[in-house]
């Protein structure tokens, strides 16, 4: 597959939904993680991302406008020892619980399926970074319906060996749509990762659709020292 420019990918899609990027910095020094949230409804847009321990959680920007917390309030990122979990829903907790019990990322997600938000049946996307011996490996997954059919759940898993300057990008929606928003199709997209954490963060945030973007989390993990750098950007301030 052709390696894509993440800036162009985002700028050319008004509504990819929620997205995960995992890869390795161009200088080979850092594991790179990004997670973004977009929204169309008042309930979806009424959110901010805040730090929680080594990870993050979402919370309502204006609690009075929170109509349904079930699919919008969750912990997208949690850390367990040398493993960082990133997902677009409460399956973060499922993966954390399974890994803590010595079970696998795949086994955890096989207990879950797409979100129950008919007619979209939004995919659940998940990633895992595992640090080891000055390097790392990573995985991505998507749990989706077959063309919006809730009786036909599908699950896909992808395993990667990191390459300098390369990441993989998966998002919930192929593009905007009505009455049903079409789910992401195919493999995670190979994308270039350029610059330091601030350059990377700016590249993502400035190219997400201005009306629909809600929050962005980025993290660079130094593979030699384990030092973590994190950036969080919220539209609501």
Regions found by a protein language model. Give the residues of each.
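Conserved short alpha-helical segments that host acidic/polar catalytic motifs at enzyme active sites
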Residues: 1-237
């Amino acid at each position: 597959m052709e390696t894509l420019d993440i800036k162009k990918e985002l700028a050319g899609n008004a509504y990819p939904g929620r997205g995960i990027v995992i890869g390795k910095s161009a200088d080979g020094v850092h594991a790179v993680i990004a997670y973004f949230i977009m929204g169309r409804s008042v309930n979806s847009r009424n959110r901010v991302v805040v730090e929680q321990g080594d990870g993050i959680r979402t919370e309502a920007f204006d609690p009075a406008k929170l109509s349904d917390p079930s699919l919008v309030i969750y912990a997208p990122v949690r850390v367990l020892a040398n493993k960082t979990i990133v997902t677009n829903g409460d399956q973060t907790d499922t993966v954390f619980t399974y890994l803590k019990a010595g079970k696998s990322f795949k086994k955890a997600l096989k207990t879950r399926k797409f979100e129950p938000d008919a007619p979209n049946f939004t995919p659940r996307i998940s990633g895992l970074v595992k640090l080891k011996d000055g390097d790392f490996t990573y995985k991505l997954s998507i749990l989706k319906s077959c063309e919006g059919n809730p009786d036909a759940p599908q699950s896909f898993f992808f395993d990667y060996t990191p390459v300098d300057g390369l990441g993989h990008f998966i998002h919930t929606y192929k593009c905007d749509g009505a009455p049903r928003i079409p789910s992401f199709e195919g493999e995670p997209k190979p994308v270039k990762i350029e610059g330091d954490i601030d350059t990377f963060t700016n590249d993502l945030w400035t190219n997400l659709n201005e009306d629909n973007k809600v929050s962005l989390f980025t993290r660079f993990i130094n593979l030699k020292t384990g030092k973590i750098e994190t950036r969080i950007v919220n539209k609501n301030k």
